[in-house]
Amino acid sequence: MSGNSFGKLFTVTTAGESHGPALVAIVDGCPAGLSLTEADIQPDIDRRKTGKSRFTSQRRESDQVKILSGVFEGVTTGTPIALLIENADQRPRDYSQIKDLFRPGHGDYTYFKKYGFRDYRGGGRASARETVMRVAAGAIAKKYLREKVNLTIQGYTAAVGAIRAERIDLSAVEKNPFFFPDEVQIPHLEQLIMKLRRDGDSIGARLNVIAKGVPCGLGEPVFDKLDADIASAMMGINAVKGVEIGDGFAVVEQKGSFHRDELSKKGFLSNHAGGTLAGISSGQDILVSLAFKPASSIRIPGKTLDINGKAVEVVTTGRHDPCVGLRAVPIAEAMLALVLMDHYLRYKAQRG
C-alpha cells in the first residue's frame, strides 16, 4: 500500500487505522524558523472532532496532538515534524458481527480484492478517522501561509441535502455544529439530521472552500497544474464524489462572453475561473466546491455478499455520522492548505 504520502517539497505521510492504538504523521519540508507548538495545531483538530454535538458520530476521542520531533524551543528546525494522536475510544466489537461481510458503499470489497486481507474494524485505513492527521499537518501549512504569505483559508457547508445556504455570512460558520453560513437555516438542519438519526439513514452535502491572498504564479503546467492538484487532493478525501473549481459544471450553460474573466487596470472583473488560469494561480481567490456522498454506514438493511460469495443482508452498527460532510470542513481546508503550501515552496525554489 504505497499511496500514503502527499506533496513534493512539503510532504505529508500518514499511518494508522480507525481502531488501532494511534495515528501518526510525518511532515517533511517545513522551513525552519516557524513558531510552532501543539496549541497551534489543536484548534483545527478540535473543529473536526466527533462527539461534540448530537448531530455527528458519538465516538469520543480526546484527539490531543503531540509533537515528537522537528520543533525545538517552540520553533521548527527544518527537520521532519512527527505528530501523534492516540486512539482512546476504539470499539472494534461493534464490527465483529459484520467482519466477514462487505458493507455496501464502503472499501471493504475493494480492499479485500486488492490485498486479500482487510481490517474490518471501522474500515481500518479506509476510515475517515485517518483524516485527523491530514488536519494536523494542514494546520502547520495554514499557519505558515497565514504568517509568511498572508494567505488565509476558510471553508463552510453550502448545502445539506436540499437545504442550501441562501445567504453567506462567514462570521456565522464557527457558531454552529454544521459550519453553516446561514443562521436562518440552522433549525431546519437540526430537524433534518435528527430525522435521519431516527430513520437510520444519511444524506449528502456540499462544501465550499476559499483561499484568499494567493500569490499569482503558483502551479506547474502541464501535469502539475494548481487546479489539477487541488482536485486530486479533494478527491482523496473520504466520501468526496465531485469537485468544482470556480463556476465548475455551471460553465456548461455559460457563454464565453460571460465566463471569460476580463481584465482592467484595477484587476479582474470577475472570477468564474476560481483563481486559476492555465493551471497557474491568477492572484484571485481560489474557489473550490466539494460534493460528499451520503454515508453508507446506516441502520437500514442492505443486500451484500460475504467473503465466501454468499448473498446476505447487512445492517451496519457502530457510531456513525448522518452526514459525513458536517465534519469535513477542517479536512477540506487542510488539503487545500497542503496543496498551496507545496506549490508555494516550489514557486519560491524557482524564483529564488
Curated annotation (Swiss-Prot):
UniProt GO molecular function: chorismate synthase activity; FMN binding
Positions of NADP(+) binding: 48, 54
One Gene Ontology cellular component annotation held by this UniProt entry: cytosol
Subunit structure: Homotetramer.
Entry binding sites for FMN: 125-127, 238-239, 278, 293-297, 319
Record EC number: 4.2.3.5
Pfam family name, one: Chorismate_synt
InterPro entries for the chain: Chorismate_synth, Chorismate_synth_AroC_sf, Chorismate_synthase_CS
Pathway entry: Metabolic intermediate biosynthesis; chorismate biosynthesis; chorismate from D-erythrose 4-phosphate and phosphoenolpyruvate: step 7/7
Cofactor: FMNH2
Name of the molecule in the record: Chorismate synthase
